[in-house]
Design a protein with these regions (language model features):
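Ligand-binding pocket segment of bilobal, Venus flytrap-like solute-binding proteins
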Residues: 1-23
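Solvent-exposed, polar/charged alpha-helical surfaces in well-ordered, non-transmembrane soluble domains
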Residues: 11, 51-55, 64, 139, ...
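Conserved C-terminal helix/tail region of periplasmic/extracytoplasmic solute-binding proteins
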Residues: 107-151
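Soluble non-cytosolic domains of exported or imported proteins
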Residues: 4, 44-48, 132-139
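Periplasmic-binding protein-like
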Residues: 17-40
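Mature extracytoplasmic/periplasmic domains
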Residues: 39-116
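Solvent-exposed loop/turn segments at secondary-structure junctions
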Residues: 7-11, 28-30, 43-44, 60-61
Length: 151
């Protein structure tokens, strides 16, 4: 079966003990980026709460969780603090696992000796051919998707 899947879907399939390979295209990877933006009208206690959340989000725990799904944290050094040496080697350095590699929920994803598809962070990010954003036709596509789901 060939399927277009995002990293969390691949994590879910592998955590069920099923073989699943993330096959890169010869043209390169497609990548997405996400971030935070505050309206200039955000003031006072609301701004304080937003900054507290953003600081927590970038402090490492969330980044490690995302890394364990196959995504990448915006702040790699803080995420590294929440990962074992073996996890970091597997997810970020393209090294063979020394022991079991677990999903964010604790399910087994890989065994000793296995390597992550696509290699290291540098290999994968160095092979990005297209950066995606929300497409102009996003609202149309979401509307059509919802119509299909409702039918």
């Amino acid at each position: 079966v060939i399927q277009s899947m995002w990293s969390p879907a691949i994590t879910a399939v592998k955590s069920q003990g099923k073989d699943c390979v993330y096959q890169p295209l010869k043209e390169g990877y497609r990548a997405w980026a996400a971030g935070f933006a505050l309206p200039k009208t955000t003031k006072g206690k609301t701004a304080d709460a937003v900054y507290e959340f953003v600081n927590w989000y970038l402090s490492g725990w969330v980044g490690a969780y995302l890394n364990r799904q196959g995504y990448y944290s915006a702040v790699l050094p803080t995420a590294k603090q929440y990962m074992s040496e073996d996890e970091w080697g597997f997810w970020m350095e393209g090294k063979a696992a020394k022991g079991d590699i677990l999903s964010p929920t604790g399910a087994k994803l890989a065994s000793a000796g296995e390597k992550r598809d696509g290699g290291s962070y540098e290999d994968r990010m160095g092979g990005v051919a297209c950066w995606n954003a929300t497409m102009d036709e996003n609202k149309y596509m979401v509307r059509k998707w919802n119509e299909m789901v409702a039918s």
